[in-house]
Amino acid sequence: MGRKRISSRRFRARAVARPTFPSGELGDVTDLRNAAETAIHQCLDLGAEESIAVVTDDERRPIGEALYEVAAEVTADATFVQYPPGDQHGQEPPEPVAAAMKSADAFLAPTTRSLSHTRARSAACEAGARGATLPGITEQVMVAGLDADYEAIASHCEDVLDQLGDADEIRVTNPAGTDITFAVGDREWHEDTGMIRESGSFSNLPAGEVFVAPADANGTFVVDGTMMPHGLLGEEQTLSFEVADGHVTDISDDAVSEDVAAAREKVGDAATNLAELGIGTNVGVAELVGSVLLDEKAAGTVHIAIGDNASIGGD
């Protein structure tokens, strides 16, 4: 047990990265197929005797089709369901979508709005289905985050846990001015390897991170990567957050500060709670793109989230 220090060249609070694609290659059919093959073969390890449901919406159809086409080459029991995009994250999908997820051995959900925290998703996993949601996925993010070696990503997760798993305290610094210390306490570290092979298991894709809900945190963290509502920050743009006793006390950016203040009026102190310390382990992600789903997974980066963390072991 002891204290660990992390120095990160790039640092973000729940934000994301832009891989540089040569002209004309973004969304290339071959690249998209390679990424789909990773999801079906490496992540799900789908079997010929299994059933799978690919559920998508009107705005993510090309990604859904790529996943379905690869799945249909593995099993004759592959279902494709498309519906209009929801209005917000966490909105329940239409009943036929929920039924398809629940009745399958495996599911993949590339959708505009997240199905991660829906009754439909949890009911599917409780019924024994294993699967992944891909909220807000784009072809660029799909290729950058899934055309990768997920066995290597899982190994990298284990390496990071070996280094940090027994630490009582973790200090994060970077040249932009981040200097924040987390007390881990008895909180459990989690790993998101993207290997979804056990009945009832669930993940986001692209995957690749280890994370913990810290018991306490104090200091300053400076975001120089991705931060909503701004997306990918400019080269000289940074946002700073002051943290005391596990809560954000000051934010340098007016737009973000207003968002957090509005959330606090609705949910109270949970809006300022320092919810998560995460470390990216996806060795296939070379650059930030401005998508939280991908950027927080980039190997060698650190992300911090504020908000409710009960689902990952917080209070």
Language model features by range: what are they?
Residues L67-E73, A123-E126, R187-W189, Q237-S240, ...:
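Short, solvent-exposed amphipathic alpha-helical segments in soluble enzyme
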Residues D168-T173, L239-E242, I251, V302:
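Short polybasic amphipathic segments
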Residues P19-V222, T226-G231:
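Active-site bordering "gate/hinge" segments
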Residues D245, D250-G280, A286:
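C-terminal, non-catalytic macromolecule-binding modules
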Residues A270-D315:
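Cysteine/selenocysteine-centered motifs that mediate thiol-based redox chemistry or coordinate metal-sulfur cofactors
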Residues D58, A176, D186, G225-M227, ...:
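A broadly conserved detector of short glycine/acidic/proline-rich loop/turn motifs that flank catalytic sites
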Residues P214-A261:
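Oxyanion-binding "anion nests"
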Residues M1-V29:
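Terminal disorder- and signal-encoded targeting elements
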